[in-house]
Amino acid sequence: MASQGTKRSYEQMETGGERQNTTEIRASVGRMIGGIGRFYIQMCTELKLSDYEGRLIQNSITIERMVLSAFDERRNKYLEEHPSAGKDPKRTGGPIYRRIDGKWIRELILYDKEEISRIWRQANNGEDATAGLTHMMIWHSNLNDATYQRTRALVRTGMDPRMCSLMQGSTLPRRSGAAGAAVKGVGTMVMELIRMIKRGINDRNFWRGENGRRTRIAYERMCNILKGKFQTAAQKAMMDQVRESRNPGNAEIEDLIFLARSALILRGSVAHKSCLPACVYGLAVASGHDFEREGYSLVGIDPFRLLQNSQVFSLIRPNENPAHKSQLVWMACHSAAFEDLRVSSFIRGKRVVPRGQLSTRGVQIASNENMETMDSSTLELRSRYWAIRTRSGGNTNQQRASAGQISVQPTFSVQRNLPFERATVMAAFTGNTEGRTSDMRTEIIRIMESARPEDVSFQGRGVFELSDEKATSPIVPSFDMSNEGSYFFGDNAEEYDN
């Protein structure tokens, strides 16, 4: 997708920068990553973690959550105004796992939020470094995307569980800024908007008064973000209708659900970034890597290279398969929860199996789980090839928006053809084309019907050897097209519940 003049690159959003050239972008992303790494090293020192304990992904997640909580202004203010049982508004903490006498022990720690934010700022040259915080949020969001299914959330908002591939970033906090908005899927934006409209239907004052004015601005901004993800004029026009509605109600919800369905064929532009756990950056900084000087990109070879020589461990429950745990984390690291499994398998160099076949639960360990039986193992996060992350959704040409790949939101810019039965998707569009958006609906359906399954996404794009850092000789994989490669089919994963 040719970048429009108005769009900043994702790295620029990531670092809050204005237009910069590639070198400047690489340097500022590097500065952000280096800051996370320095913070992590300092926290390991504070907590007196051994080298092994510092490489434990569960400890990394606790430390990341602590700093995110320390900087969550809104929640901190809310906690101070509504003192609830057992929540100290000034402190944050979580489980830290230590290896003692050959056993893993859980220790609950508590720190002053002020102390944590001081350490964070100190690691980031005295700045708030919001970009680094957002980066960690996106890593947590990618981990949730790979771990949980959102069927219940989809059904609650009147959407169809088959739309799960549109739900990237559905657990990202509202405060995740432009970089967060870029990685949200079409379904996620639709769901946020529907929730908002439903509140407006149930609460007469939602759109009224000073608060209502702010709500309205937020509503229109979310509509514009979603509009920016669509690539056809008809879809964009329909979003204008939804945005300009005097008082949004059921008609708008209908329109949004229609648009979400249409995104199964006419893919939205959703960014993908490889965001790694803080401990990986910490390890690299500790071994003397200067991220700012070397530069870093979230969408190129750098994260692959970092994972090639990082050893990260994970706690494993008694009946979990360590190889499956590794796959889960690998997918999260590369934001590949919604990628075609055949593409992922080729890049990883190991078969990536659908989630219903994984013998592993989430990475985080609940506080009531028995530590006696916990073991730990090395996560295998290396890959055979690397590929450029995409932000286009993989439609072959924007002018007549051909079919993107159903049940998949491509992560890697790698050529694949489109295994789908258009009839099954088109069945979702029978019936209602009347109402004020009828001409747009008709147009969208027409575009989808003329989308040719024999079109190829990412024509000529391939994967690269890990030695080919300049991406000079693409290897275009050929896939067995007999099976549709969705991670979510035949799924029995746990639901994501806050």
Curated annotation (Swiss-Prot):
Q: Which GO terms describe its cellular component?
A: helical viral capsid; host cell; host cell nucleus; ribonucleoprotein complex; viral nucleocapsid
Q: Which domain of life is it from?
A: Viruses
Q: Does the keyword Transferase apply?
A: no
The record's Pfam families line, in alphabetical order, gives: Flu_NP
Q: Which GO terms describe its molecular function?
A: RNA binding; structural molecule activity
Which intervals of this chain are the motif Unconventional nuclear localization signal?
Answer: 1-18
Q: Does the keyword Metal-binding apply?
A: no
Q: Where is this region: Disordered?
A: 1-23
Record localization:
Virion; Host nucleus
Which GO biological process categories is it annotated with?
symbiont entry into host cell; viral penetration into host nucleus
PTMs per UniProt: Late in virus-infected cells, may be cleaved from a 56-kDa protein to a 53-kDa protein by a cellular caspase. This cleavage might be a marker for the onset of apoptosis in infected cells or have a specific function in virus host interaction.
**Family annotation (InterPro entries):** Flu_NP
Chain ranges for the short sequence motif Bipartite nuclear localization signal as given in the UniProt record: 198-216
Q: What is its main location?
A: virion
- State the UniProt keywords alphabetically: Capsid protein, Helical capsid protein, Host nucleus, Host-virus interaction, Ribonucleoprotein, RNA-binding, Viral nucleoprotein, Viral penetration into host nucleus, Virion, Virus entry into host cell
Per UniProt, subunit arrangement is: Homomultimerizes to form the nucleocapsid. May bind host exportin-1/XPO1. Binds to viral genomic RNA. Protein-RNA contacts are mediated by a combination of electrostatic interactions between positively charged residues and the phosphate backbone and planar interactions between aromatic side chains and bases.
Task: Give a short account of what the protein does.
Answer: Encapsidates the negative strand viral RNA, protecting it from nucleases. The encapsidated genomic RNA is termed the ribonucleoprotein (RNP) and serves as template for transcription and replication. The RNP needs to be localized in the host nucleus to start an infectious cycle, but is too large to diffuse through the nuclear pore complex. NP comprises at least 2 nuclear localization signals that are responsible for the active RNP import into the nucleus through cellular importin alpha/beta pathway.
> Family assignment?
Belongs to the influenza viruses nucleoprotein family.
Among HAMAP family, the record links this protein to:
INFV_NCAP (MF_04070)
* Protein known as: Nucleoprotein
